[in-house]
Amino acid sequence: MFLPDWQPITVDLPTEWEFAHLYFVHDLHYGSELFDARKWMRLKDRIISDKYGKVLFIGDLFENAIPGSKSNMFTQTANPAEQKEFVTQQFIDLKEQTIAIVPGNHCSNRTTKTAGLYPLYDCALLAGMGEKYRNIIAFLNIGVGTSKKNKSKQVHYFGQIQHKAKDCKNYGTSDFTDGIDFFAFGHDHNPKETPRSKLVFDKQNNVIYKRNIENIDCGSFCQFGGYGAEAGYRPQSDKMYMLTIFGEEKRMETSGFYLS
């Protein structure tokens, strides 16, 4: 069975790297008639060609429509087995770049709830990445480069990813966990970067300081239409985000880009 969410995923990237690029992939919805294959292939090619690129998968990679779900089973472009085959192949193609995998509601509220199965975990196992899967939340400890202050240590970044999250003005799921440097989520198909901060009382040194947190949602790979259009939702931006973490000193940069 999959490892518990409380077990962090620890990754030590090469000590000679001066930085690493983190890409957040979620809401592909492969199998939906709205899946934007062109957008996905452009991002996939970018990740593969990026020597310093790493990817974190954050749920809803396939549509997985079932009776009673919002999705229309009769307009799917691939059946559930074919959807799993597609996602498994993406995992295989990006195995060396992948740091973590978590599912979304199109797994947990559908196949898992109705049949007790975990289709995205199956994909991870078939791709030889079962140890990178967490069922709701993945906590990350990523080391990169060589610290300027201590040549025997890497610079470490601590992150949290999960598919669904709250992101209100004065309250967010990113506030739940002390010590994280970045938080990434999806589900709402609304790309945005909403950096947060919190005050930290350093009890050991009796000082108070501010800690910054990068808070990122990379939208979706869906074209406009379907039940979103029927419900009167507005079209969402195609913007994507990449987080750069640096290796000599602790520093992060979030950059936005378009793939069209």
Describe these PLM feature segments.
Residues 1-10:
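Short glycine- and acidic-rich boundary segments immediately preceding or forming the N-terminal edge
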Residues 134-136, 237:
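Residues that act as N-cap/strand-start positions at coil-to-secondary-structure junctions
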Residues 9-21, 25-134:
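Core catalytic region of metal-dependent phosphoesterases/phosphodiesterases
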Residues 92-93, 114-128, 151-153, 174-178, ...:
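Short, surface-exposed basic-aromatic patches at helix termini and helix-loop junctions that form
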Residues 158, 162-252, 257:
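Conserved beta-sheet core of the metallophosphoesterase superfamily
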Residues 103-114, 244-260:
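Charge-rich, low-complexity terminal tails
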Residues 11-23, 139-159, 210-213:
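Beta-strand-turn-beta hairpins that frame and shape the catalytic cleft
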Residues 26-29, 144-146, 163-165, 219:
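Short, flexible loop/turn elements at secondary-structure junctions
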